[in-house]
Structure formats: structure tokens, C-alpha cells
Amino acid sequence: MIFDEDVKFCASLLQKSDPQRFRSIMAAPEKLRPYYFVIFAFNVEISRAPYITKEPMIAEIRLQWWLDVLDEIIGEIAVRKHSVATPLSKYIGKIQAKELKVLVNARRWDVYSNKFKDFSELKKYLFDTTVILFRVAAGCESGKYEKDFQNACMAIALANYLMATPGLKKAGKVPISGLPTNEIEEQCK
């Protein structure tokens, strides 16, 4: 299958930034790969926005830029030219764009060094940043297996979050109050 330049860029971005996910996508049916490359490249762009600068305002501007892209998709307005935004507008519709806005807004937590007040706040963050992403990627809507799907995604989200704990601490974040981060850090080595 021949991919256009934007999809190739998304695949390359994913290969560099999230090699495990890139390899997983390479195991997917060939006709689905462009869609997955674009969705998960979007996630790379969103998830790294707060970490490429120490200035919260710049991170907020980057996240707002993506919210504006999603608003353009929702409003069926021509999306600005960008190697991830342009193909994203080809692969998702209004419903998915609205869901992805929740994901982008959840990433605002990453901009600041605030801690989660309790586990329910962490669960909401994990839901908004992972379950929504996988639901959009899978093309799922509420259905017979929605709860099972959500539970599987939450397990993935929590495992990834715990593995990221050492990096979060290094970046000055407080992953969650009362969480034994030193123990988790040792287990992740």
C-alpha cells in the first residue's frame, strides 16, 4: 500500500516517539494502518505538548491550537495545513473530533505540577486520555461490550501511567498524593 506524505510523516513520528505502538500498528491490517498512524500521531502531538517547554503558556497555546483544529473538523471548515492535522481531518468526523477535544483538555493537567486530589480524579484523567483515544481509534460507540472495552483500556492506561511515574517525577509532576512513587520507580527499572 502506498501512503501519502502526511501519513508517512505520521508513521515516522510514531516510529520515533512511540516505537511499541508503531510496531503494533504494523501488525494491523494494511488498509487500517494509515488511520491508526494518524490517530496515534495526533496523540503524540498532544501528549508531548506540555513537555517540550517549561513555559505553561506556550504549552497551553499548543493545546489550544489542537482544539482549534478539532473545532475546524467539527465545523467542517478547511483544516489548516499540517502534517498531522490535515490527515486527521480526513480520517475523523464531528463525533470523534468532539471526543478528542475531551482528550486535549485532559492534557492540561500535564502542563502544571498539580497533583490529583484522589484516585477518582486520576481515573477521570486516564479515561479521558486513554479510553477516549482507543475508542476513537477502534471506531467504537456505546454497545454491548462497552464496559469490557473501557475496563481493558483503563488497565492499559493505569499500567502506562505507573510506568511513566519516574518520568513524571523527574519533570516535577506529582503523579498522585499518597501513591508510593519511589516503590513504583524501583519496580519500573
Model regions and ranges:
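Acidic catalytic motifs of isoprenoid enzymes
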Residues: M1-K189
